[in-house]
């Protein structure tokens, strides 16, 4: 049971992190300076 809970926590943390990264990329790509600095991130 402890192992299941630990893996669930890890999954939740990973989902939160990927969500935050997606938000950061979106906000970067909508900012022209950041977009110019990171063209590989912004399609």
Swiss-Prot record:
Q: Name one GO molecular function term.
A: acetylcholine receptor inhibitor activity
For domains, the record's comment is:
The cysteine framework is I (CC-C-C). Alpha4/7 pattern.
InterPro entries documented for this protein = Conotoxin_a-typ
| Family of the protein in this entry | Belongs to the conotoxin A superfamily.
* Pfam families according to UniProt: Toxin_8
| Disulfide bridge partners, by residue number | 28-34, 29-42
- Organism field: Conus leopardus
Query: GO CC: one term?
Result: host cell postsynaptic membrane
Q: Protein name, please?
A: Alpha-conotoxin-like Leo-A1
Function of the protein: Alpha-conotoxins act on postsynaptic membranes, they bind to the nicotinic acetylcholine receptors (nAChR) and thus inhibit them. Has possibly a distinct nAChR binding mode from other alpha-conotoxins, due to a different three residue motif (lacks the Ser-Xaa-Pro motif).
Question: Where is it made, tissue-wise?
Answer: Expressed by the venom duct.
């Amino acid at each position: 049971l402890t192992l299941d809970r630990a893996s669930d926590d890890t999954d939740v943390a990973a989902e939160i992190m990927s969500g935050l990264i997606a938000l950061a990329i979106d906000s970067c790509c909508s900012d022209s300076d950041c977009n110019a600095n990171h063209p590989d991130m912004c399609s």
